[in-house]
């Protein structure tokens, strides 16, 4: 077995539906991973400041691929961030503002931004995923490096909106689903696998050394990349098709069960 890196998504994967995880179990596992020199990476569409809130004791020890790959941190230090040009940002914002029913968050290096006129329920939902969230009068006046946009919609509207944005923003941003009604607009090529690849290069490791665990469309590239790819029991069907292996759902500690299999050297890690 040559596992040197374990990468996990958060929502619908590492976290249960109550947005918590079995901390005593994981902390014991983490100490064992550390002893064996196995690195732990969180890869999520969420904001870095939100992600570190789940790992206050470990935030300067582990690595984070945040914002779906647009922001990479190792041991508390920023290694990489994506960047839209000011012109590209204006095009994207202009397109999103065409639909008056569409609420969205603009994600930047310093903060995430939401319209001061956005519905309270939308702001409250987004605040759970973006711990730094500032209200703005005009998205076009944001003075920050922008690298992602996030929308939340009823599930039945998602395919139509994705198709529309795919055409309108072709070459500038790519829409991906991240579960729970979320659509993220990412810079083409700046997905989770790209962020993980940056860390692997730094560590002189390869995808052959990686275990990746996920449940949604934004996990597809990292699952295709990793030698040991696991779909959660609650994963979207297309993700189950992509992953080589399956684990339990997020309410039955599916991600922690994979980590335990690595530590116990049981199937598929014993072949």
Swiss-Prot record:
Its EC number(s): 3.1.3.23
Induction cue: Regulated by the cAMP receptor protein crp.
Binding sites annotated in the UniProt record for phosphate: 10, 44-45, 192, 218
Alphabetized Pfam families for the sequence: Hydrolase_3
Manner of cofactor binding, per the entry note: Magnesium. Can also use other divalent metal cations as manganese, cobalt or zinc.
Keyword Metal-binding appears in the UniProt entry: yes
GO molecular function: fructose-1-phosphatase activity; magnesium ion binding; phosphatase activity; sorbitol-6-phosphatase activity; sugar-phosphatase activity
Gene3D superfamilies linked: 3.30.1240.10, HAD superfamily/HAD-like (3.40.50.1000)
Alphabetized InterPro entries for the sequence: Cof, HAD-like_sf, HAD-SF_hydro_IIB, HAD_sf
UniProtKB keywords: Hydrolase, Magnesium, Metal-binding
Catalytic site: 9
Function: Catalyzes the hydrolysis of sugar phosphate to sugar and inorganic phosphate. Has a wide substrate specificity catalyzing the hydrolysis of ribose-5-phosphate, glucose-6-phosphate, fructose-1-phosphate, acetyl-phosphate, glycerol-1-phosphate, glycerol-2-phosphate, 2-deoxy-glucose-6-phosphate, mannose-6-phosphate and fructose-6-phosphate. Appears to have a low level of phosphotransferase activity using monophosphates as the phosphate donor.
Subunit field text: Homodimer.
UniProt record similarity statement: Belongs to the HAD-like hydrolase superfamily. Cof family. SupH subfamily.
Protein name: Sugar phosphatase YbiV
Organism encoding this protein: Escherichia coli (strain K12)
């Amino acid at each position: 077995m040559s596992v040197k890196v374990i990468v996990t998504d958060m929502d619908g994967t590492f976290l249960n539906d109550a947005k918590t995880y079995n901390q005593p179990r994981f902390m014991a596992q983490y100490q064992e991973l550390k002893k064996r020199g196995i690195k732990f990476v969180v890869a999520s569409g969420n904001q870095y400041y939100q992600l570190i809130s789940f790992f206050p004791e470990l935030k300067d020890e582990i690595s984070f691929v945040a914002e779906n790959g647009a922001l990479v941190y190792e041991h508390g230090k920023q290694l990489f961030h994506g960047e839209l040009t000011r012109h590209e940002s204006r095009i994207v914002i202009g397109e999103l503002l065409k639909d008056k029913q569409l609420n969205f968050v603009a994600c930047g290096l310093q903060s995430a931004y939401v319209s001061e006129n956005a519905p309270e329920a939308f702001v409250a939902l987004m605040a759970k995923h973006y711990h730094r969230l500032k209200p703005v009068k005009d998205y076009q006046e944001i003075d920050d490096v922008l690298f992602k946009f996030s929308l939340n919609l009823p599930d039945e509207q998602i395919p139509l909106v994705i198709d529309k944005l795919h055409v309108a923003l072709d070459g500038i941003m790519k829409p991906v689903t991240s579960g729970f009604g979320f659509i993220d607009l990412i810079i083409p090529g700046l997905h989770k696998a790209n962020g993980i690849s940056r860390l692997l290069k730094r560590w002189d490791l390869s995808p052959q050394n990686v275990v990746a665990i996920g449940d949604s469309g934004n996990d597809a590239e990292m699952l295709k990349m990793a030698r040991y790819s696991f779909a959660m029991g609650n994963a979207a069907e297309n993700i189950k098709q992509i992953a080589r292996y399956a684990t339990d759902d997020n309410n039955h500690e599916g991600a922690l069960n994979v980590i335990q299999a690595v530590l116990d050297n049981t199937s598929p890690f014993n072949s």
